[in-house]
Amino acid sequence: MKSKAEKSQFSKLVSDNGIWVVLVVLIIFITIINRNFLTPNNAVALLTGESVKGVMTFGVTLAILSKGIDLSTGSVAALSAICSAALCQASTTKLWAGLPTMPAIVGILGGIAIGVIVGFANGWMVAYLRLHPFIATLGTQLICRALCKLITPGPVSKLTPGFRFLGNGKIGPFHMIVIVMIIMFIILAFMLKMTRFGKSVYAVGGNDQAARVAGINVEHTLVKVYIWCSFCAALGGVLLAGRSDSADPANTGLNYELDAIAAATVGGTSQTGGICRPSGVIAGILIMGVINNGMVMMGVNDQMTFIVKGLIIIGSVAFDMRKNAVKK
């Protein structure tokens, strides 16, 4: 009986932390193929490389948790990056001629404000116009990317040192971009576990009608969800601009929404809504980072990497739906 109980506890432990087991197995597999994968320098490169996508994943997580989706995050990141970069150009040839070079904080807040406005629009369309989140955010995705190309046909570059610090700077041995991701994760975890808003998002995602009966303002909750989502996307865009010292209307944030959705889904945020573990989201981000980094180190081309990511998204959603069907 003791043996069976121990086996049951072990099975529960693996089941509850299966995503971390997958991460460890993946790391071991890639390390066997390329021993340079598990080195301190590559670990730092992986973390800094995935930090922006991580921040954006924290936003998408709430949208999925509310039984929605946000396809606009990559384009919102690009629009915010371009606007914030334009405010903080140190070059003599500016995108907006005659505009003085602004302090870094003005550029950062300006870029984030753009994201908040788009997030409000997304939330309003989903909550009050009753548009499906897929349609609403697909529309804003196209609009934001088009606005990027209307604002500037080419990259906005040569940014001020203060602005670049957010993406490239360090505080002691720690990269600023990683610190920002950790802070955003702490905010997400606190929000979901300790605040009324977080509990409302769980309730709306689980059953919006029951949430309404329980006195939750479903519309206000959804608007806040999409504002948070675009806030994270805009912050990600600002980080991208600071890290690369430029913002490109065609390439900045391109397809980042796919990685964010994949990471959130792989991390256990259910596409059916109402289910999310913040620790699982971190594991999902790391898994996607390991795949991205590992594929490069193994010499796999970009198209094959996209195929693998697509299969991961399909597999994760299929597994999630099957698991929920069994529970019902």
Residues of each region from the PLM?
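Cytosolic-side transmembrane-helix boundaries in multi-pass membrane proteins
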Residues: 1-26, 32, 213-220, 293-328
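Membrane-interfacial amphipathic/re-entrant helices at transmembrane-helix boundaries
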Residues: 2-57, 92-106, 216, 224
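Single transmembrane alpha-helix segments in multi-pass membrane proteins
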Residues: 25-91, 124-131, 268-278, 311, ...
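Inter-helical junctions in multi-pass inner-membrane proteins, predominant
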Residues: 35-49, 148-149, 158, 192-193, ...
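Alpha-helical transmembrane segments within multi-pass membrane transporters and channels
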Residues: 92-141, 283
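Helix-loop-helix "hairpin" substructures at the membrane interface of multi-pass membrane proteins
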Residues: 103-110, 117-122, 173-248
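Transmembrane helix-bundle core of multi-pass membrane transporters
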Residues: 105, 129, 133-194, 221-224, ...
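Transmembrane alpha-helical segments in multi-pass inner-membrane proteins
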Residues: 233, 244, 248-310
